[in-house]
Amino acid sequence: MSARWTTAVLDPQTTGGWAVARSPEGFLVDANGALFPRDWLKRQELDVLCEHGIGHFDGQPVFLLELRTASEVQGCNWQGLRRFMLEGDFDTYKVLGYAAQIGTWAREHRFCGSCGQPMTQIHWERAMYCQPCDLRSYPRISPSMIVLITRGDEVLLARSPRFVTGVYSTLAGFAEPGESAEECLVREVREEVAIEVRNIQYVGSQCWPFPHSMMLGFHAEYAGGEIVMQPDEIEDAQWFSVHDLPPLPAGRSIARYLIDLYVARRLGLAEPVLPA
C-alpha cells in the first residue's frame, strides 16, 4: 500500500465516497480515470452483483461495484487491469488491483463450498459467511516464488508460449501444500529447466492480482546441470550476459526488478526500487 491508498473494510450502507466499477471486460474508465463519484456511479444503469467497501484513497472512502455484465455508460469505456499496470498512475493501479482481487473472490464465493447455500457478506470483516455451516470464506491469496538464477555476469532467462513475442523473464511457480518458498523454488527450477541452485536469497515480494498471487522474489546462484526445458511450459531458456539482455518484462513487475537489481549490482549502478 502507498501513502495515498490504504485498504479497509467499509460498510456499503454508508453514503458518499468514490467507487470503481468492474465487469468481466475490465474497469469502467472515462477521461478522468477509473475512480468515479460513488453516488453518480450508482445512478447509472449498471448490473451490480455486489458492492464492497475496500479502502481509502487520498483520505476518501472507496467502494467496488462488482458487475455481472458490462454496460454502456456515455463517455466511458472498459479497460483491462494489465493496461493500468503498464500505464498511468501506479497508486490508482494499486486500488484497482485490490478491487480486482476482492471482486474475483466475491464472485466466486456467492455459494458455500460445503453445502451449496448462498453466502452472505459480512461488513465488519473481509469475509463471506454461510450460516448453516458456520463457515467463513476469506479472500484467496496464492503464494508463488519467482527467481532470477545467476552465474557471474550471466542470468538465466526463459520464455513461456504465453509471453509477448520475444520477451524473456525469470522462472516462477506456485507453492504446493507443505512447501516452504525455498523448497518451491528448488522444485520449480528442476521442473522447468532441470538445473540445481544454491545460495538462495530472498529479495522482496509483490502482489500480482492476475488473479490473486503473492509473488515472493529471490536471487539464486547456479549450482550445476544442463538446461532441459519442460515441455508445454518453457518455450526457450538460455543464459544471457548482463551486457546483452533480450526484451524484458514490464518495468513495474517484480520479474523486471529482480533482473534490474542484479544488473545494477554487477555493473555498479544505482539500485532500482521495487514498486510496492
Curated annotation (Swiss-Prot):
- In this chain the Nudix hydrolase domain maps to 139-262
Q: Give the family this protein belongs to, as stated in its UniProt record.
A: Belongs to the Nudix hydrolase family. NudC subfamily.
Listed cofactors: Mg(2+); Mn(2+); Zn(2+)
> What PANTHER family does the record tag this protein with?
NAD-CAPPED RNA HYDROLASE NUDT12 (PTHR42904:SF6), NUDIX HYDROLASE, NUDC SUBFAMILY (PTHR42904)
**Note on cofactor:** Divalent metal cations. Mg(2+) or Mn(2+). Binds 1 zinc ion per subunit.
Know the name of this protein? NAD-capped RNA hydrolase NudC
Q: What class of enzyme is it?
A: hydrolase
Q: Which residues bind substrate?
A: 82, 125, 138, 206-213, 255
Q: What organism does this protein naturally occur in?
A: Pseudomonas entomophila (strain L48)
**Protein keywords:** Hydrolase, Magnesium, Manganese, Metal-binding, NAD, Zinc
